[in-house]
């Protein structure tokens, strides 16, 4: 084949030595001459693989404690030489072609993540020769093969076996893309780290100043193309965090979930599933969250998942049609059967799905069934919000109050049952679009008022939703994601039958708001924490 390039000489120099010995043995078996450096060379030699030290190949020793090893014309000339063009120059300078380079870089991300890492530690783990070889080889992909991921070793060996020791241009180009992605991520990590440091009193040291660097670099990997975006006239794709760059690859999420069956996820499916899953993750007892247009329309805790689903559905059966359902436990056969017999649903997501449940859901071939895995801790990460010409970055809202954090500000103390419902209601309100009002009773939402421009209207909407579904508001509790600016919201809640309110507090009219609650005989609890969601 015209674009095939034989591999006769390879340079191997890796920090992560996973699979490198087996790869080197396979190359040697095909007659490939091996060059290497430092620890990689020692590993090969100790295991009987013939290897030439790069310093012997170049005729120049490693210097400056290994800082300069591969930065030499005999290395980069051998990599960058254009086959069929540069042979005379190579002969005049005694440069031998290097056909394959396998390199991965110093572990910068792991180093700076360690507690007590100093700037000096970070600097010594900035790879120079490695990225230079990677970029050189990727640039000359027409003639040379670059490998930066151990997962590609077998792929290259298989192709060489099938092509008389050669690689194809298609493979070399694909590997070159991976190489440039690799070096882009690496430099981005370094820029992010340095961008959060400020000089300290010592000229050789810095200290951490901010989690927000001067320039923000990240890397996302395309998971799938989507049929269209939020609307049919918009094109779209779904990108996920690169685990090597962002270190979040193992978090249970819609991004890491495995689709077990159903049609391809749409743009809106993904956004709504994220909202549902993140909400249900707040609960430790068996819980179900039903979401429509990014807002919870039904949330409940139950004795088991079936009970939780039945109660969540009861909140708003109308809105639940075509919704997204999330659970915080293994989806079982009884719950799956209840769902498919009762309603049309776009997506079901759970940490685990039993085989019996899978068999039942299979009757609805288009229903998207996702398994996201268990979650144990909350991962620290950032939220992004795109604005025209810029990007807003903030910590993810992982704040949540407990019983010991809230303050009763009314004359009447909430009962134990009311306080339990307040905690439940507050968790739900965190995931409702502002202005958010949630009515709840017995660990089940009664009405949800979302996205109204005034808080009092959100309260009215919650009441209307409850009335439309025949749910009794009397003696329910209410959560508000932000403070009440006026007493009208309290008056509306009292008129609807609300007995107790949880809200952040912090209004200049707090005294007036508390007085209104006392006037109506309501209990009121302040959290001191707001949960705006836009």
Swiss-Prot record:
Its EC number is 2.1.2.3, 3.5.4.10. Disulfide bonds: none annotated. Keywords: Hydrolase, Multifunctional enzyme, Purine biosynthesis, Transferase. GO terms for biological process: 'de novo' IMP biosynthetic process. Pathway: Purine metabolism; IMP biosynthesis via de novo pathway; 5-formamido-1-(5-phospho-D-ribosyl)imidazole-4-carboxamide from 5-amino-1-(5-phospho-D-ribosyl)imidazole-4-carboxamide (10-formyl THF route): step 1/1; Purine metabolism; IMP biosynthesis via de novo pathway; IMP from 5-formamido-1-(5-phospho-D-ribosyl)imidazole-4-carboxamide: step 1/1. The keyword Plastid does not apply. One of its GO terms (molecular function) is IMP cyclohydrolase activity. One of its GO terms (cellular component) is cytosol. Residues 1-148 form the MGS-like domain. Pfam families: AICARFT_IMPCHas, MGS. It catalyses: (6R)-10-formyltetrahydrofolate + 5-amino-1-(5-phospho-beta-D-ribosyl)imidazole-4-carboxamide = 5-formamido-1-(5-phospho-D-ribosyl)imidazole-4-carboxamide + (6S)-5,6,7,8-tetrahydrofolate; IMP + H2O = 5-formamido-1-(5-phospho-D-ribosyl)imidazole-4-carboxamide. Belongs to the PurH family. The IMP cyclohydrolase activity resides in the N-terminal region. This is Bifunctional purine biosynthesis protein PurH. The lineage of its organism: Bacteria, Pseudomonadati, Pseudomonadota, Gammaproteobacteria, Alteromonadales. The gene is purH.
């Amino acid at each position: 084949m015209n674009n095939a390039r034989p591999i006769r000489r390879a340079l191997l120099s890796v920090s992560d030595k996973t699979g490198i010995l087996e790869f080197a043995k396979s190359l040697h078996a095909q007659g490939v001459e091996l060059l290497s450096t430092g620890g990689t060379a020692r590993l090969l030699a100790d295991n009987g693989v013939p290897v030439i030290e790069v310093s012997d190949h170049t005729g120049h020793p490693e210097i400056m404690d290994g800082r300069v090893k591969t930065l030499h014309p005999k290395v980069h000339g051998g990599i960058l030489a254009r086959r069929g063009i540069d042979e005379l120059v190579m002969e005049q300078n005694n440069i031998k072609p290097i056909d394959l380079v396998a390199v991965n870089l110093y572990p910068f991300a792991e180093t700076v993540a360690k507690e007590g890492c100093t700037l000096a530690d970070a600097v010594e783990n900035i790879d120079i020769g490695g990225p230079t070889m990677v970029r050189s080889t990727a640039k000359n992909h027409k003639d040379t093969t670059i490998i930066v991921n151990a997962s590609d070793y077998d792929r290259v060996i298989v192709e060489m076996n099938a092509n008389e020791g050669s690689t194809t241009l298609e493979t070399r180009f694909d590997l070159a893309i991976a190489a440039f992605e690799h070096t882009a991520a690496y430099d981005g990590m370094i820029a992010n780290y340095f961008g959060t440091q400020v000089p300290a009193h010592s000229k050789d040291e810095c200290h951490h100043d901010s989690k927000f660097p001067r320039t923000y670099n990240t890397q996302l990997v395309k998971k799938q193309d989507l049929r269209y975006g939020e609307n049919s006239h918009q094109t779209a794709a779904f990108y996920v965090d690169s685990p090597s760059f962002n270190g979040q690859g193992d978090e249970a999420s819609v991004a890491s979930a495995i689709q077990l069956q159903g049609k391809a996820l749409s743009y809106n499916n993904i956004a709504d599933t994220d909202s549902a899953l993140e909400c249900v993750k707040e609960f430790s007892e068996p819980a179900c969250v039903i979401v429509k247009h990014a807002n919870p329309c039904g949330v409940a805790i139950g004795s088991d998942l079936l009970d939780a689903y039945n109660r969540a559905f009861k909140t708003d059966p109308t809105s639940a049609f075509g919704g997204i359902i999330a659970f915080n436990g293994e989806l079982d056969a009884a719950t799956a059967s209840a769902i498919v017999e009762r309603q049309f649903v776009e997506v079901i997501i759970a940490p685990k799905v039993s085989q019996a449940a899978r068999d039942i859901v299979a009757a609805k071939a288009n229903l998207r069934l996702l398994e996201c895995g268990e979650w144990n801790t909350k991962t620290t990460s950032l939220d992004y919000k795109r604005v025209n010409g810029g990007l807003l970055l903030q910590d993810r809202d992982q704040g949540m109050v407990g019983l010991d954090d809230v303050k009763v500000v009314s004359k009447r103390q909430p009962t134990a049952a009311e306080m339990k419902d307040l905690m439940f209601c507050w968790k739900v309100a965190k995931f409702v679009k502002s202005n958010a009002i949630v009515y709840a009773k017995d660990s089940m939402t009664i009405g949800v008022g979302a996205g109204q421009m005034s808080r009092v209207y959100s309260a009215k909407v919650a009441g209307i939703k409850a009335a439309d579904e025949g749910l009794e508001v009397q003696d329910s509790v209410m959560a508000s994601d932000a403070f009440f600016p006026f007493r009208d919201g309290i008056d509306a809640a009292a008129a609807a039958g609300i007995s107790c309110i949880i809200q952040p507090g912090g209004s200049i009219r707090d005294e007036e708001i508390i007085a209104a609650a006392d006037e109506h005989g309501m209990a009121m609890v302040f959290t001191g924490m707001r949960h705006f969601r836009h």
